[in-house]
From Swiss-Prot:
SUPFAM superfamilies: Nucleoside diphosphate kinase, NDK (SSF54919). This is Nucleoside diphosphate kinase. One of its GO terms (cellular component) is cytoplasm. Its EC number is 2.7.4.6. It comes from Albidiferax ferrireducens (strain ATCC BAA-621 / DSM 15236 / T118) (Rhodoferax ferrireducens). Keywords: ATP-binding, Cytoplasm, Kinase, Magnesium, Metal-binding, Nucleotide metabolism, Nucleotide-binding, Phosphoprotein, Transferase. It is found in: Cytoplasm. InterPro entries: NDK-like_dom (IPR034907), NDK-like_dom_sf (IPR036850), Nucleoside_diP_kinase (IPR001564). Homotetramer. PANTHER family: NUCLEOSIDE DIPHOSPHATE KINASE (PTHR46161), NUCLEOSIDE DIPHOSPHATE KINASE DDB_G0292928-RELATED (PTHR46161:SF3). GO terms for biological process: CTP biosynthetic process; GTP biosynthetic process; UTP biosynthetic process. GO terms for molecular function: ATP binding; metal ion binding; nucleoside diphosphate kinase activity. It catalyses: a 2'-deoxyribonucleoside 5'-diphosphate + ATP = a 2'-deoxyribonucleoside 5'-triphosphate + ADP; a ribonucleoside 5'-diphosphate + ATP = a ribonucleoside 5'-triphosphate + ADP. The lineage of its organism: Bacteria, Pseudomonadati, Pseudomonadota, Betaproteobacteria, Burkholderiales. The active site is at 117 (pros-phosphohistidine intermediate).
Length: 141
């Protein structure tokens, strides 16, 4: 087992539903520790930069518009196999295909408003965490 970090974003739809605490409880119940966290209202520039990997995809503009539509809760999570564990907690990107009991099955409205973002690999997680938490403000506990 490998202790690793992953980035999680609770998206504007889930923040608006006031389910941050319920989502955090799921992280902690799965053995993931929140090692950095902040609430932010992303600018268009920040959202475009963060999701730049998708810039040529047809959904890019809608994704950026959604991510700047309200505040988001951004956290770095740490634990055994954190990337996979978080992805299992999130469920399928399309909440209609997400397994019952996953975050997206329980809190997401659509494939666009799908409640959460999670890093897809440890390497991606390192880049994503550095994007939102540059410097020395991520603390193991």
């Amino acid at each position: 087992m490998t202790v690793e970090r992953t980035l999680s974003i609770i998206k504007p739809d889930a923040v608006a539903k006031n389910v941050i605490g319920q989502i955090y409880a799921r992280f902690e119940a799965a053995g993931l520790k929140v090692v950095a966290a902040k609430m932010a209202h992303l600018s268009a520039r920040e959202a475009q930069a963060f999701y730049a990997v998708h810039k040529d995809r047809p959904f890019f503009k809608d994704l950026v518009d959604f991510m700047i539509s309200g505040p988001v809760m951004i956290q770095a999570l740490e634990g055994e196999n954190a990337v996979l564990k978080n992805r299992d907690l999130m469920g399928a990107t399309d909440p209609k295909k997400a397994a019952p009991g996953t975050i997206r099955a329980d809190f997401a409205d659509s494939i666009d408003a799908n409640a959460v973002h999670g890093s897809d690999a440890a390497e991606t997680a390192a880049v994503e965490i550095a994007f939102f938490f540059p410097g020395m403000n991520v603390y193991s506990r």
